[in-house]
């Protein structure tokens, strides 16, 4: 018999059963899921990159010729 894994909600820290039946996992509720989405949309959360990484990544995207 296996025990149901429990994680903490990334937004509020409440314990959450991490099962397929929990449609909000790893969040405890739709509210916490939307709070997290809003934080990403307003750039409160960011994925760290080297300062010049974007310049190299997008350097070929813009053609200086008109």
UniProtKB/Swiss-Prot annotation:
- One GO molecular-function annotation for this sequence? DNA topoisomerase type II (double strand cut, ATP-hydrolyzing) inhibitor activity
Give the keywords, sorted: Metal-binding, Zinc
Q: One Pfam family this chain carries?
A: YacG
Cofactor, how bound (note): Binds 1 zinc ion.
> Looking at the record's lineage, which domain of life comes first?
Bacteria
Q: Which cofactor does it need?
A: Zn(2+)
Transmembrane as a keyword of this entry, yes or no, is no
* Residues noted as binding Zn(2+) in the record, renumbered to the chain: 9, 12, 28, 32
A Gene Ontology biological process noted in the UniProt record is:
regulation of DNA-templated transcription
**Signal sequence span per UniProt?**
none
Q: Where are the transmembrane segments?
A: none
Q: Which family does it belong to?
A: Belongs to the DNA gyrase inhibitor YacG family.
PANTHER family to which the protein is assigned, alphabetical = DNA GYRASE INHIBITOR YACG
Q: How does it assemble?
A: Interacts with GyrB.
What is the annotated role of this protein in its UniProt record?
Inhibits all the catalytic activities of DNA gyrase by preventing its interaction with DNA. Acts by binding directly to the C-terminal domain of GyrB, which probably disrupts DNA binding by the gyrase.
Q: What is this protein called?
A: DNA gyrase inhibitor YacG
- According to its UniProt entry, this protein's organism is Pseudomonas fluorescens (strain Pf0-1)
Q: Which gene encodes it?
A: yacG
């Amino acid at each position: 018999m296996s025990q149901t894994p429990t994680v903490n909600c990334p937004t509020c820290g409440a314990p959450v059963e991490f099962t397929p039946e929990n449609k909000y996992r790893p969040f405890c509720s739709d509210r916490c899921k939307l709070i997290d989405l809003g934080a990403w949309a307003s750039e409160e959360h960011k994925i760290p990159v080297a300062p010049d990484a974007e310049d190299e990544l997008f350097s070929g995207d813009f053609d200086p010729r008109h």
